Amino acid sequence: MSDETMPVEFLVSDKRLLKTIKVKLETNGLFVTPIYSDNDNKVIKSSIEDLNHPLAVEINNIAGVKARFHESGNLERSEGHLKHQSNSITEFTKSFLKDHGLANDKIFLSHLLDHLPLKYTIYPPVVLFNNSTVRSFNHPIWQKAFQLKLFDPNEYYRELLCFLSPGKPSKGTSLHPNNRLLTHLAINNPITEADVLRRPFNIQPLYGKLIDDSILDDNDNTLWENPSQEQLNSSIWCKVIQNGVTQIWSPVFTMFSRGNIKEKKRVLTTFPDICNNDVVDLYAGIGYFTFSYLTKGARTLFAFELNPWSVEGLKRGLKANGFNKSGNCHVFQESNEMCVQRLTEFLSQNPGFRLRIRHINLGLLPSSKQGWPLAIKLIYLQGASLEKVTMHIHENVHIDAIEDGSFEKNVIVELDAINESIALIRNRGIKLQFVRSKLERIKTFAPDIWHVCVDVDVIVST
């Protein structure tokens, strides 16, 4: 999935406007719960990630409303609320720098603050700053301050972590894992789009080791492709709870997409027919959507994922959520091109078991087209045991193709063409019809580019 960007939120001084703004956002699939308080104002969150987004501009032009980025960062918590710092990172840094001898050099102090990173995400025990060329500790002005030893960067980072921490334990006590002190700082640089494993090669530690140096070897591909349990255990593992579901991952080797929370909730609240039916997740990752399907009572879930570090996060998440006890989630660390063979083997090993695949998740960006033929082959494999199977197709799409309907039309045309070639070999006495059900806008990926999920109902007839 994409590198993280900060969401836009709306500071509302007139409470009578709350419903109007909420409805505008909900209509466009951009409202994010909950609404929270900031002093005497209310703050409405959104999944918009650009202040120049047309709807952000429209709402910002309403008297009594101010659009802004959430500069103080976001802390995922079990109750789903944001941890909102009353004092910004800017004020903290200004105070620190003045206390360390820069009070009289107002120009240099101002330059440092102008390039101070403000956008970050808290994933205990790590604070990840967003990638930026303008506001970054890698900016020449900050590097100059470090080189001149005007202050100790480690001291600054350490105190910054204390400032950002949601709480400090009293003597002789410990915090809940979600509320423990933060211990690591890093910069979350973009992933390489061509990398099918979606690995964050460019994550840059600032404070604290994200992985034990002793296991690092630039010439050893096994660390990425086939890590030992010792290597897996040597990494920092982050944890968040979204919609009551725990997710775990190594920030060094895998990505986490906060913006998917809205789609995860949709899975949890929209599809009652998940219960007691089967699901195939062709791009499982760390369990982004896998856990939502399991929470909804999927009978059996088949998860495919290439990245061994993602698989480890998936397995840790299964255990943390208690899903490992039932044994109904089958994880395959290999290409999803093996899915038909693996499910065929599963059927042969479980006599009397009849597949009831009701949902097939295709959650890969920028495009999941590689998995479309596989999904169709799986439907032919199961035959006519269900009258309908829903494919959840994730893609990055230009806004024009969404609004004129051409994207959805082209999806159906492509699926029909794929099915025509597959049906010649695998029809098994059934016919498939592809019907557009719903297009969900999840988040903006880039200017005019949306991450969407289109639900396609596959009608199965004999």
UniProtKB/Swiss-Prot annotation:
Entry's Gene Ontology BP terms: tRNA methylation; tRNA modification; wybutosine biosynthetic process
Pfam families reported in the protein's UniProt record: TRM5-TYW2_MTfase
Lineage, highest ranks first: Eukaryota, Fungi, Dikarya, Ascomycota, Saccharomycotina
GO cellular component terms, A-Z: cytoplasm
Family statement drawn from the similarity comment of this UniProt entry: Belongs to the class I-like SAM-binding methyltransferase superfamily. TRM5/TYW2 family.
Family annotation (InterPro entries): MeTrfase_TRM5/TYW2, SAM-dependent_MTases_sf, TRM5-TYW2-like_MTfase, tRNA_wybutosine_synth_prot_2
Catalytic activity: 4-demethylwyosine(37) in tRNA(Phe) + S-adenosyl-L-methionine = 4-demethyl-7-[(3S)-3-amino-3-carboxypropyl]wyosine(37) in tRNA(Phe) + S-methyl-5'-thioadenosine + H(+)
Phenotype seen when the gene is deleted: tRNA(Phe) from mutant shows accumulation of 4-demethylwyosine (ImG-14) and absence of wybutosine.
Pathway participation: tRNA modification; wybutosine-tRNA(Phe) biosynthesis
Predominant place of localization: cytoplasm
Role summary: S-adenosyl-L-methionine-dependent transferase that acts as a component of the wybutosine biosynthesis pathway. Wybutosine is a hyper modified guanosine with a tricyclic base found at the 3'-position adjacent to the anticodon of eukaryotic phenylalanine tRNA.
Species name: Saccharomyces cerevisiae (strain ATCC 204508 / S288c) (Baker's yeast)
Keyword annotations of the record: Cytoplasm, S-adenosyl-L-methionine, Transferase, tRNA processing
Note: Present with 656 molecules/cell in log phase SD medium.
GO molecular function, one term: S-adenosylmethionine-dependent methyltransferase activity
Gene: TRM12
Protein name: tRNA wybutosine-synthesizing protein 2
